[in-house]
Amino acid sequence: MWIFYFPAVISVLIVTLYFYFTRTFNYWKKRNVRGPEPVVFFGNLKDSALRKKNMGVVMEELYNMFPEEKVIGIYRMTSPCLLVRDLEVIKHIMIKDFEVFSDRGLEFSKEGLGQNLFHADGDTWRTLRNRFTPIFTSGKLKNMFYLMNEGADNFIDHVSKECEKHQEFEIHTLLQTYTMSTISSCAFGVSYDTISDKLDTLAIVDKIISEPSYAIELDMMYPGLLPKLNLSIFPSVVHKFFKNLVNTIVTQRNGKPSGRNDFMDLILELRQMGEITSNKYGNNMSTLEITESVMCAQAFVFYIAGYETSATTMAYLTYQLALNPDIQNKLIAEIDEAIKANGGKVTYDTVKDMKYLNKVFDETLRMYSIVEPLQRKAIRDYKLPGTDVVIEKDTVVLISPRGIHYDPKYYDNPKQFNPERFFAEEVGKRHPCAYLPFGLGQRNCIGMRFGRLQSLLCITKLLSKFRLEPSKNTDRNLQVEPYRFIIGPKGGIRLNIVPRKDVS
């Protein structure tokens, strides 16, 4: 008898699910906020969820759909989010009214790696930020420079040996060997060779970190679900690797700072304190216990900031130099002159003071922002300046640096690689929020100066000995890898590295 009711039950179930997954789809219409029509189950993120397009590309496309709007109403699954286009509104969110948008709203279990400086919110973030900011001061970076320099010299030796065998390289993979060496030394006080026995595990860890699991999609489409299920976006192998790494270093240093003044020394100083405090809003004190989990979480986020993002940025930079020989020639001339003026040595100040090199780096990040979108969550109701839109508490706000960086309103011929955009007079003409590779305000990338320094040093050393040229396999129309967390090139980047004939 039940077989007669089965079609009716299925129909009711389908209708129920349909209404459940579309129940919020009038949210922005009721508030007179324009936006694209959402799709059942996926909202506006179907191509990202199905791994057809990178999230950064999806956000750029959404940004371009409504060029006259200050904000665009979109949906992550059933959750209403606001994509902000207007630069003045962005300035309020990131800087002027930061206290309303101090949280990122990346919600998952606070156990394991969850309590890191990037993902943490509220008092935990403020406490961590207050304590970890000092490691990225100019003085600290200058003290670490000799470690970076050793890594860069070893990298150049490696490239020289490889060039005797072949000229073509997959440049991103090659540059990862340098950033791994640098981060191992500057952060953890170990040489690349010391952890060679763990490279197989590290390769797995890198793949897992770079290629998002469906837990990330769940976090995006069902905000708040992961903490309820006590889940993390990172599998247990990642937790285990960083736990073992930190424990090994703590044991080697007998649980005390070593005097290297590296990242692990700072961690150990905090560990000796047992807990750390900082001021909350309202002048109350916030306290965070320095557990093994907290230590591992900070080691993890430092690794992320210093390894993959820098390698990817340098890969794009070398790609553009290979395709633009005039720019490469100008940069080589600056590098040669700077090194000669410093007696043949490359110092911290040598790298920092090369103006054209820094402009090339900035233009690379304009064209190839690495992590997108920028995300903030309102901690209370907030009326957007210059609009009638009220953002309700806990609403997620998104910003697309890629959309802004390719907007012809702010950059002429935005698809063209042109470091001249970053001469002071040109920068002064633009809105400060027209360039957002590191975010802006108090929640900008805390490691941006470290990443810049290690990248510029590597490029300086590389171009002092070699030229970069397209190979027969160079893709002149790079596509973005659709499923990586980091916005990397699909299929990698193949270039020729050719020893310079004018240097010994």
From Swiss-Prot:
Superkingdom classification of source: Eukaryota
Membrane topology listed for this record: Peripheral membrane protein
Record keyword Iron present: yes
Subcellular location: Endoplasmic reticulum membrane; Microsome membrane
InterPro entries, A to Z: Cyt_P450, Cyt_P450_CS, Cyt_P450_E_grp-I, Cyt_P450_sf, Insect_CytP450_Detox
EC number of this enzyme: 1.14.14.1
GO terms for MF: heme binding; iron ion binding; oxidoreductase activity, acting on paired donors, with incorporation or reduction of molecular oxygen, reduced flavin or flavoprotein as one donor, and incorporation of one atom of oxygen
Matching Gene3D superfamilies: Cytochrome P450 (1.10.630.10)
Top-tier EC class: oxidoreductase
Induction: By phenobarbital and the insecticide permethrin.
Residues given in the record as heme binding sites: C445
Catalysis: reaction(s): an organic molecule + reduced [NADPH--hemoprotein reductase] + O2 = an alcohol + oxidized [NADPH--hemoprotein reductase] + H2O + H(+)
Family the UniProt entry places it in: Belongs to the cytochrome P450 family.
Protein name (record): Cytochrome P450 6B2
Species for this entry: Helicoverpa armigera (Cotton bollworm)
